[in-house]
């Protein structure tokens, strides 16, 4: 059975195949904006992409897959974080890039073959913007910013079906006039390709034919995918939140500049809910991987829980699902210990692989796996089982001892101490540290905050 994946563009299940003469499958997925730790909603998308990468390698062979994932290291959020902390932009983005890599490794996500940064590809972005200017798809505003003219691309909206939703995409398409905004865009739906330098940007600007500034968000993916994968790629993926406007804008930029189809296949994973609600800081349900580790859960349990729902359906993430995941992993470890060496029993686990080949149906794959496990070892062998574990990205090493959960009262003391330290009230901060120590905890300060660990006895 061939690997088939739902295509967000055609709304059909389609077989994945490389299109270039060298037989290499070219795969791009949007990476993080590195200004803060990624949360588990972000990691659902990255884990899904990791499963896809693994299945592509099983299908075509590892040397025949080329995976690119970008890092957005300059935008409004990264610049604001650097300004607020009084640090160079590169220091801030390096810190959060390192953290992202560490979390990906803990979740057993394969690193991309190439991980380009926006700041490392300014020339490529300027060149693509210049191409769009030359072809009449972009224009320079009075302040030096450059905008893409949405009305110049007749196919705009075909990915997201914006026209079907009667979304205003410009006076030329919608037949209605729209007010010109403060940035002097010709139409309200036009989007920035190049942002003219403003005082809040600090030193984070570059020279261009239109004056100093920085690239817009959308152009980076078009420029970097072109450089590293070519003008037409086989697959572009991301979370459903990126479908519009980001991916729609990528198509417009790339196809207007290059004159060929940008991506042959599009795939989007759905949102993650926590306890049935959308994640938000105000609800206290915006978990990072570290948050869950501090509650005593292993990264593999987090990965397993993220696989428990179909990637194209919303997944309700709960702490109960993590407890269930830990038990499931223990069962898989015990099962593997009963298996003998060998490698001829791939047919035993064929239903698991078949489920993954059918639109990455991870819950069906896990169900098929436990049907096999519950029957006993039978003909199964270690190598065949490990092949399935590779496909799912599950490492069955013995988990480390779980960390103790921090009591709410200790967390409250830590928050007060951190606030006192930020206010330079060091006497209060020292007194609160002693209270925390008396409760059996150590508070460790970091540049970006603090951590709590049980005090050493």
UniProtKB/Swiss-Prot annotation:
One of its GO terms (molecular function) is zinc ion binding. It catalyses: tRNA(Cys) + L-cysteine + ATP = L-cysteinyl-tRNA(Cys) + AMP + diphosphate. Its cofactor is Zn(2+). ATP binds at residue 281. Binds 1 zinc ion per subunit. It comes from Opitutus terrae (strain DSM 11246 / JCM 15787 / PB90-1). Disulfide bonds: none annotated. This is Cysteine--tRNA ligase. Zn(2+) binds at residues 30, 221, 246, 250. The lineage of its organism: Bacteria, Pseudomonadati, Verrucomicrobiota, Opitutia, Opitutales. It comes from the Bacteria. A motif ('KMSKS' region) lies at residues 278-282. NCBIfam families: cysS. InterPro entries: Cys-tRNA-ligase (IPR015803), Cys-tRNA-synt_Ia_DALR (IPR015273), Cys-tRNA/MSH_ligase (IPR024909), Rossmann-like_a/b/a_fold (IPR014729), tRNA-synt_1_cat_dom (IPR032678), tRNAsynth_Ia_anticodon-bd (IPR009080). A motif ('HIGH' region) lies at residues 32-42. Keywords: Aminoacyl-tRNA synthetase, ATP-binding, Cytoplasm, Ligase, Metal-binding, Nucleotide-binding, Protein biosynthesis, Zinc. Belongs to the class-I aminoacyl-tRNA synthetase family. It is an enzyme of class 6 (ligase). Its EC number is 6.1.1.16.
């Amino acid at each position: 059975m061939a690997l088939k994946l739902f295509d967000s563009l055609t709304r059909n299940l389609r077989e994945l195949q490389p299109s270039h003469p060298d037989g290499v499958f070219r795969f791009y997925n949007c990476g993080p904006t590195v200004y803060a730790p990624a949360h588990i909603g972000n990691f659902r998308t990255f884990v899904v992409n990791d499963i896809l990468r693994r299945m592509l390698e099983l299908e075509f062979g590892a040397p025949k897959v080329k995976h690119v994932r970008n890092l957005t290291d300059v935008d409004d959020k990264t610049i604001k974080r650097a300004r607020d902390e009084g640090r160079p932009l590169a220091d801030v983005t390096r810190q959060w890039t390192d953290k992202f890599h560490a979390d990906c490794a803990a979740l057993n996500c394969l690193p991309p073959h190439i991980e380009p940064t926006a700041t490392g590809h300014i020339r490529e972005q300027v060149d693509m913007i210049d191409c769009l200017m030359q072809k009449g798809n972009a224009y320079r505003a009075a302040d030096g910013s450059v905008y893409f003219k949405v009305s110049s691309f007749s196919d705009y909206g075909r990915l997201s079906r914006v026209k079907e939703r009667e979304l205003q995409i410009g006076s030329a398409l919608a037949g209605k006039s729209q007010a010109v905004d403060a940035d002097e865009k010709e139409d309200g739906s036009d989007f920035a390709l190049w942002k003219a330098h403003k005082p809040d940007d600090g030193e984070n600007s570059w020279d261009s034919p239109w004056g100093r500034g920085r690239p817009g968000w959308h152009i980076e993916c078009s420029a970097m995918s072109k450089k590293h994968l070519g003008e037409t790629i086989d697959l572009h993926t991301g979370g459903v939140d990126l479908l519009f406007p980001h991916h729609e804008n990528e198509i417009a930029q790339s196809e207007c500049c290059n004159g060929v189809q940008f991506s042959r296949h599009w795939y989007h994973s759905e949102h993650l809910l926590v306890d049935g609600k959308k994640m938000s800081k105000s609800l206290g349900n915006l978990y990072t991987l570290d948050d869950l580790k501090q509650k005593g859960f292993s990264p593999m349990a987090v990965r397993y829980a993220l696989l428990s729902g179909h990637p194209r359906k919303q997944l309700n993430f709960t702490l109960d699902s993590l407890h269930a995941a830990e038990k499931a992993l223990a069962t898989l470890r015990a099962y593997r210990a009963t298996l003998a060496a060998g490698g001829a029993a791939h047919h035993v686990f064929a239903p698991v692989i078949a489920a993954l080949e059918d639109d990455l149906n991870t819950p069906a794959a896990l169900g098929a796996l436990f049907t096999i496990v519950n029957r006993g070892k039978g003909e199964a062998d270690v190598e065949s089982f490990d092949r399935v574990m590779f496909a799912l990205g599950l490492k069955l090493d013995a988990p480390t001892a779980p960390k103790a959960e921090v009591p709410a009262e200790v967390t409250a003391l830590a928050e007060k101490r951190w606030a006192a330290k930020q206010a330079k009230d060091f006497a209060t901060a020292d007194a609160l540290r002693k209270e925390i120590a008396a409760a059996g905890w150590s508070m460790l300060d970091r540049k970006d905050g603090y951590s709590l660990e049980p005090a050493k006895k």
